[in-house]
From Swiss-Prot:
The encoding gene: glyQ
CDD domains from the UniProt entry: GlyRS_alpha_core
Organism: Brucella anthropi (strain ATCC 49188 / DSM 6882 / CCUG 24695 / JCM 21032 / LMG 3331 / NBRC 15819 / NCTC 12168 / Alc 37)
Protein name: Glycine--tRNA ligase alpha subunit
GO cellular component: cytosol
Record's subunit section: Tetramer of two alpha and two beta subunits.
Top-level division of the source organism's lineage: Bacteria
Its EC number(s): 6.1.1.14
Taxonomic lineage from the root: Bacteria, Pseudomonadati, Pseudomonadota, Alphaproteobacteria, Hyphomicrobiales
Family: Belongs to the class-II aminoacyl-tRNA synthetase family.
Enzyme class: ligase
Keywords: Aminoacyl-tRNA synthetase, ATP-binding, Cytoplasm, Ligase, Nucleotide-binding, Protein biosynthesis
Pfam families on file: tRNA-synt_2e
Length: 311
């Protein structure tokens, strides 16, 4: 399935490319997240000393970006392709350029530039040194070396690549409207477009995000998720005298952190959060993320008993 002829072909090509370079090809996380970085395969696995290589597609929701399906390239629900490699290899940029060749963008035939743009996620307490990758004047992906996640220093540093799949597909297919993208690579009566798959949902979720979401219920949902996250972390924490006992309930707690973040984004879209409240909500989500990150380091996956080479 050719990557320049269909949305699904683009995804399959990236899967094959990164699988050939040693990445575990994971599935999307089954939660409402604002970006692929929220997937625990990135947020949590970027912490601790254990090596990690993974790639996956992640449906992402940003309620404020909805335009009722009337904007040709702005969506409240879209797809990111995420690659996370720890420790970051010295040839990460070359690997990335190789992925562009795989999907039909030869860097020698196009104006490919890396524009410095350090990345930050306030709710995750994360930041990294980064670059946007521009191809012929259009941003197609983000290239980041994580320095801190969940307020915790990353050691070793992870390399992260994020492709905006719709934008990339529009570029390689040569279309100006996301809804005109060929989704399945067929033509005639069998052709399925991006609009046939997603336009109605985009219209309906825009109405929900901006007009219908129950704001009082959302405020309570945030409180509930916050309390549940902290209760789960407390229940799974090692006892005070158990120096070698690991944490037992990080992932369920992190799910509640993700829920709190999405509820915050919905309230923001509904316009019911003041400037001062906004900062308070961000700090509350960041606090949950920090607690989850600290707990993850007390697990096997987080490297609690891991010994690096030479130790």
């Amino acid at each position: 399935m050719h990557p320049t002829r269909s949305f699904q072909g683009l995804i399959l090509t990236l899967h094959n490319y990164w699988a050939e370079h040693g990445c575990a090809i994971l599935q999307p996380y089954d939660m409402e997240v604002g970006a692929g970085t929220f997937h625990p395969a990135t947020t949590l696995r970027s912490l601790g000393p254990k090596p990690w290589k993974a790639a996956y597609v992640q449906p992402s929701r940003r309620p404020k970006d909805g335009r009722y399906g009337e904007n040709p390239n702005r969506l409240q629900h879209y797809y990111q392709y995420q690659v996370i490699i720890k420790p970051s290899p010295p040839n990460l940029q070359d690997l990335y350029l190789g992925s562009l060749r795989a999907i039909g963008l030869d860097p020698t035939l196009h104006d490919v530039r890396f524009v410095e743009d350090d990345w930050e996620s306030p709710t995750l307490g994360a930041w990294g040194l980064g670059w946007e990758c521009w191809c012929d004047g259009m941003e197609v992906s983000q290239f980041t070396y994580f320095q801190q996640v969940c307020g915790i220093e990353c050691s070793p540093v992870s390399g992260e690549l994020t492709y905006g799949l719709e934008r990339l597909a529009m570029y390689v297919q040569g279309v100006d409207n996301v809804y005109d993208l060929n989704f399945n690579g067929l033509e005639g009566d069998e052709k399925v477009t991006y609009g046939e798959v997603f336009l109605q949902a985009e219209q309906e979720y825009s109405r929900y995000n901006f007009e219908m979401a129950n704001t009082e219920a959302l405020r309570q949902h945030f409180i509930d998720a916050e309390r549940e996250c902290e209760a789960i972390l407390k229940a799974g924490a090692p006892g005070p005298n158990a120096n070698h006992q690991m944490h037992k309930s990080v992932f369920p707690a992190y799910d509640q952190c993700i829920k709190a973040s999405h509820v915050f984004n919905l309230m923001d879209a509904r316009g019911v959060i003041s400037v001062t409240e906004r900062q308070s909500y961000i700090l509350r989500v960041r606090n949950l993320a920090r607690q989850c990150g600290e707990a993850f380091l007390l697990t096997d996956a987080g490297g609690f008993n891991f010994k690096r080479e030479g130790e």
